[in-house]
């Protein structure tokens, strides 16, 4: 009920703070409109940026609430909704290669056919959807501090017969890299083999 859309100008003092925070994360007006980004100034989600996720039918299936101030003790506040879902499913074309990232800010930076895991491993619903839709190619782009998780995820996907590409994020998250540098890395990435995964486990 406290949600206010950020693509509409507001006299609320937090409006400017929210826009400033998003600009700092390279999120502009087009992204705000595309992802229906808003903010809250009251209730349990006060001072937070709200980024909703919608399923294939356009129904809300999750939302992320991120504090817009740097001194916050709790950066994220999870909603009373299950994470067993497919983030940003409304934007996904299952016939095309899919990119898997950790968070919504990573997904917004990547833009094209990308699913935020809302963690480091896919939900049961997402796994089911990948199998159902017979997804052929997946790019794994987890944050730099999750190398072992990325290796484990790549092995998991390969076991399902999915062509998997494990991206070397070069010490940055997708949201830190930005759109063009991320896609440059993606296009340079070669398909992962089982032997590569084993070596990765030994050296990661």
Go through each PLM region and give its residues.
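Short, acidic/turn-prone active-site loops that include or flank metal/cofactor-
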Residues: 118-124, 142-145, 169-171
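Acidic beta-strand-to-loop metal/phosphate-binding motif
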Residues: 100, 136-149
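A generic structural motif
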Residues: 163-173
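Short, surface-exposed amphipathic charged segments that create phosphate/polyanion-binding patches used
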Residues: 48-49, 131-135, 175-188
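Short, aromatic/basic amphipathic alpha-helical patches
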Residues: 149-161
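TOPRIM metal-binding catalytic domain and adjacent DNA-binding surface shared by DnaG-type primases
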Residues: 1-50, 54-57, 92-93, 128-131, ...
């Amino acid at each position: 009920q406290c949600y206010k859309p950020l693509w509409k100008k507001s006299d609320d003092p937090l409006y400017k703070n929210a826009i400033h925070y998003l600009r700092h994360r390279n999120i502009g007006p087009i992204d705000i409109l595309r992802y229906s980004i808003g903010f809250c100034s009251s209730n349990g989600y006060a001072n937070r940026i709200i980024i909703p996720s919608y399923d294939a039918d356009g129904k809300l299936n999750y939302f992320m609430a991120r504090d817009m101030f740097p001194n916050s003790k709790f950066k994220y506040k999870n909603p009373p909704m299950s994470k067993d879902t497919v983030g940003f499913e409304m934007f996904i074309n299952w016939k095309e290669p899919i990119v898997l990232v950790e968070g919504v800010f990573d997904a917004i930076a990547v833009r094209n056919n990308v699913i935020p895991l809302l963690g480091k491993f896919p939900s049961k619903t997402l796994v089911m959807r990948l199998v159902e839709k017979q997804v052929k190619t997946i790019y794994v782009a987890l944050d730099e501090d999750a190398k072992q998780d990325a290796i484990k995820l790549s092995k998991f996907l390969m076991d399902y017969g999915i062509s998997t590409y494990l991206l070397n994020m070069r010490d940055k998250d997708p949201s830190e890299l930005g759109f063009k540098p991320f896609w440059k890395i993606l296009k340079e990435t070669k398909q992962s083999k089982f032997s590569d995964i084993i070596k990765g486990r030994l050296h990661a």
